[in-house]
């Protein structure tokens, strides 16, 4: 909490890593804020500014215990050395033995930030030992306009490199192995996962789940040359080549 002079007055200890939004008037002694995370659905809290305390005001009922899970934010180096952030959510008793399935999600475009948020469809995967990994690729706006621009047009390759480096980090740190990673993206993220097997065939991610983007709409023609030149094998006619499984919808 900061005053109008920009100085920090106090710090609110949130339930976990997550996303928060406040509402209220500047003269109020109490205000409300909404909080959500990868394992906590949207809840509303009432905050007492004088006491620096808050209490749960309203929350949906769920049939699982969010305390069974943990979310951490890690940083890894991309191909050019830039540090890239990634959120990892998994059960507290998970063993880093390189055998855990990973659901790796990325977007990396249009200045859109990927903040922590809840989805009920992820919970069964987490309960069964899976890891949900959400990587903040360049092209988003997590670190401002420079971060956005660094993943656009002739710098679009940075987005692919960031995503590949995320998968490599998860393997190197024994969260998983190359046979246990599913890469997922939709819309702009569909472009990302469609081209990943082209750019990193040696990683051989087992499964991709994506929607079809309008690939060339916002990309210079000459940037598309590396996409095709790095893929010497016909995609639709494999001629005995083994491509990662892809599901397009």
Label the predicted regions:
Residues 1-99, 110-128, 168-172:
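Peripheral, non-catalytic segments that deliver or gate enzyme domains
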Residues 102, 126-136:
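A fold-wide structural signal in alpha/beta-hydrolase
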Residues 134-249:
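Active-site-proximal cap/loop segments of hydrolase catalytic domains
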Residues 99-101, 180:
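Conserved catalytic motifs of the protein kinase core domain
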Residues 6, 11-34, 132, 179-205:
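Short, charged N-terminal helix-start/capping segments
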Residues 106-108:
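The conserved beta1-alpha1 loop
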